[in-house]
Amino acid sequence: MSTAADLPSTGPGLRLRQPGVEPLVDQDKLPSQPGHSRESSDANADANVSSDKASKTYGRTPDGTVFIVPTTHDMVSQLLDPRQPKNFSDAIVLTILGLHILAAYFLPSSYKRIVFAFVFLFWRACYNIGIGVLLQIQSNHRRLVTWARRWKLFENPATGKNPRPWLYNLLKNELETKIEEDYEFEKAPIEYNTWLVFRRVVDLILMCDFVSYCLFAIVCGHSPEGENPLIGFSRWAIGISLIGFNLWVKLDAHRVVKDFAWYWGDFFYLIDQDLTFDGVFEMAPHPMYSIGYAGYYGISMMAASYEVLFISILAHLAQFAFLVIVENPHIEKTYNPPPPRKRTASESQGDVVPADVKSLEGAFDQQTLAPTHKESPAPVHNLVGLNNIDLFRVPDFTVIVLPSYVAVLTFVTPETPVWQAIFVLHALAWRVWYHLGLGLILDKQSKTKMWTRHFLKFGESAGEAWRQWKGLHHISMIMCNTAFIAACWKMYSPPEDWAYGLVMLKHVLGAGLVALQLWTAFSVYDSLGEFGWFCGDFFFDQQAKLTYKSIYRFLNNPDRFFGTAGVWGAALITWSRSIFLMALVTQILTVFYISYIERPHMQKIYGRSLRREAGLTKFIKRSLPPPVKGWQESVDKVLDDTTQFVEDFLDTARPKFAAGVKTIVRDTSALFNMAPARLTITRIAPDLQGHDPKLYSLSVQGTPSMGTSIDDKFTGKESLTGRFPKQIKTMIYEYGAPLRVKWRAPAGHSKKDWIGLYMVTDNRSRETTEVPSLGRWAPTNAGVYDSLTADVSIAVEEHPVSTTEATEIDMVEGEVEFRGDKLWWTQGVFEFRYHHDGHHTALSISEPFEIRISKFDEEDVDVGAKGLYEQAVESALLPVVQNCLDRDPDIAPNQPEEPFGGHVERDTKYAKRIVYAIREMFGIEFAPPVVAADGSVRKLAWRVSNAKEVLAPYSMSRSRGTTTPAIQDFPAEKA
């Protein structure tokens, strides 16, 4: 079921249609709403009909077909409600469910647990893997609809084109029985009919998944020996409550999203309706997959079985994987595509203060250090995350060395009470410093800009103050967590008997709380970025802005409780008084920091724009009965008065307490070009006989590279006869430029023939291709393969060879174009191979050609004349960047000053292409985030020029620059 709750919206909780999609039905075509005039009863009836028509939901297929979306019912009602019509598929589902129940009753007791564990895991795999694969190929290639069209499932037998009329009649009866209004099987779009068939498969899988889980819980359920009756009653009461809560979540979610999102309808078509996400969608992100699985844990408590608990956790994790891998990418692609590229850059762009922290940092540095260059790009080098570790930076080096020292001491010191006390006190000291020490610094920064003033006093910039603060905060956070983990390690004693008492449960709950804190941290960082993570609005408050997306949609301060969940989880796992004390101190310090440091600053910066209540709070208050609401308002008033008194007291006492306190990678992804060449035994296709490879041919056209490789091949180091170039020259094409392949074959060639692009060194055999194409292929004929991306490569459809080129055998030809992801984004020598009938038998191989990035020629450009040099770099870089961005007008700029499209930030492949090209052209290596941060060819050219200027004194290349050593610098040479 689709859970698209975390989508951008123009209002609270509104789900947007894809930008650029016009309203499906014009307003003048829809019946108007009835007015308030007194008309006859017939007029009122017409108005009611008009209103009913206007309330219909309209859908649109990818080809633009508009249709009325009929009303459907949920699967439980369809299967179990006797008032709902039943059909053959219902009988199949109910029969399979009955077989599950019979198996649970008749199987021997010794086999029940293992059998139903495998049965449930099978249906869970059908759900998360089976449905996941179907939805993935439908989202990327619309393959389910393609299969339905190819198999002619919905083709009327009256046309004579349906090879299986019985299946058509069966589907027609099945679907029309279920949908009584606004639906005609023959007139419905193929996308909608395919979705209805897909729904029946989903019904079977979901019902079997749920029933098999319940049966597994039943066969595993028991009452622990010697259980206290009060504990048993509490266990069942909590379990039933969780099941009831789970049931309410599912029902309320279905009320909001209806069957369209419940059954992933937006993978097939879109509807002309803004879905208001209220109710349960204000409680938690993706409620059907998060809190919607609370019932699993309720059933586990009632069964009193760790087997049920562990299989519930496994199923829940599989559901989250399904969400991340299948649903989220589709939701992002469908409802939140990158914004269109600005066609012209703003003339006043250089005068606008950047809004993000990196731009602010660069802007402050420019004001204090280089005010003459307003267009200087901002630096890009994040701190948080393993992929951002750079040992050339002091903070990163420190957060590797210091935790290593702590780890060594943890392992080599004995487990004595003295050492345990030392480690606990060490962790407590870092905790107090992290919350209280850094908090006091931020408080002074908020009130007097103390931190920034300190660096300005010594001639540094505000940007440098910000960078130093980030380093201090990062080191303190890492050491705080490292010291706490070390203390937990010292205080933890592995249990001798895992089955004793609540030992296992404590470990499971503790691990769950740790996972909750990690998820909270990732969500907070994803929402705030490094600017918010390091409290950037304490340093650059004039450009700070609020965000209420992701986890902040539901909670105002997720760190207040969820941010310390892992500490309490560690206390449960260790079951140590010292760690419990640490958790309590952490909770108090966190609340203190939020209440007396963060909140006053937020109120000062944002004022009335601060949201008073989060989504979860609003939902809970709306759900309270009136008497409870009145009591809650009274309690709120008492709490407000108490809080005001405490704040006044602290304001009075603070000066006394404060007296005497002193304030204090190049990307390493490997390029897996191919699978290793391996010995292949090839079966020649039976229909290959009679196909003469000489009749097949390929010719390649592309954008010739401006550079030449002749100077590299003939350098004077060869013998005299080897210095003369051959008459036949290998074609050299631009890096990333589209390649057009013209193919020619006999008229009787297989429609499943295809053309692949390979490196010349990939294959040892000229008759058989030994390595996969890795997506770099195109069919010769359309409509043969299921892949949506295959047919788009066909530039010219198959057609007979012109009469002027007629031969003894009838020949046909066509053209395919390789661009974007179908190219090799590296330099080398390549070839195209024409393959027979969907196999890897090569009937023709093109002439080898080279893909080459021309080196930037600095001979005619004076590096010292920076303006001219930047213009030359811009001119050389623009066509290369356009190629790297697939020459897509929505992504690639037309002029150096124009910004890149939003896809560059979404997909790192574009940035990786560009930095590779820059490295080969200029010998300068940038990290991929630099491209997205700069956002234009002009800023990239400035960055290249600046890097060249910095590295010029160390360059070994020929140069006419001012840094070339003069002879007077070497007195010994004069003698």
Swiss-Prot record:
Function: Catalyzes the first step of the methylation pathway of phosphatidylcholine biosynthesis, the SAM-dependent methylation of phosphatidylethanolamine (PE) to phosphatidylmonomethylethanolamine (PMME).
Disulfide bonds: none
Catalytic activity: a 1,2-diacyl-sn-glycero-3-phosphoethanolamine + S-adenosyl-L-methionine = a 1,2-diacyl-sn-glycero-3-phospho-N-methylethanolamine + S-adenosyl-L-homocysteine + H(+)
Residue spans crossing the bilayer: 88-108, 114-134, 201-221, 229-249, 279-299, 306-326, 394-414, 422-442, 469-489, 502-522, 578-598
UniProt entry tagged with the keyword Methyltransferase: yes
Pathway stated in the Swiss-Prot or TrEMBL entry: Phospholipid metabolism; phosphatidylcholine biosynthesis
Pfam families: PEMT
Membrane topology annotation: Multi-pass membrane protein
Any one Gene Ontology cellular component term annotated for this protein: cortical endoplasmic reticulum
Family according to the record: Belongs to the class VI-like SAM-binding methyltransferase superfamily. CHO2 family.
E.C. no: 2.1.1.17
The organism of origin for this protein: Fusarium vanettenii (strain ATCC MYA-4622 / CBS 123669 / FGSC 9596 / NRRL 45880 / 77-13-4) (Fusarium solani subsp. pisi)
Database matches in HAMAP family: PEMT (MF_03217)
Lumenal topological intervals: 1-87, 135-200, 250-278, 327-393, 443-468, 523-577
Membrane side Cytoplasmic: residue ranges: 109-113, 222-228, 300-305, 415-421, 490-501, 599-975
One GO-annotated biological process of the protein: methylation
Chain intervals with Low complexity compositional bias: 42-52
Region (Disordered): 1-58
UniProt enzyme class: transferase
Protein name from the UniProt record: Phosphatidylethanolamine N-methyltransferase
Record's keyword terms, sorted: Endoplasmic reticulum, Lipid biosynthesis, Lipid metabolism, Membrane, Methyltransferase, Phospholipid biosynthesis, Phospholipid metabolism, S-adenosyl-L-methionine, Transferase, Transmembrane, Transmembrane helix
One annotated GO molecular function: phosphatidylethanolamine N-methyltransferase activity
PROSITE patterns: SAM_CHO2 (PS51598)
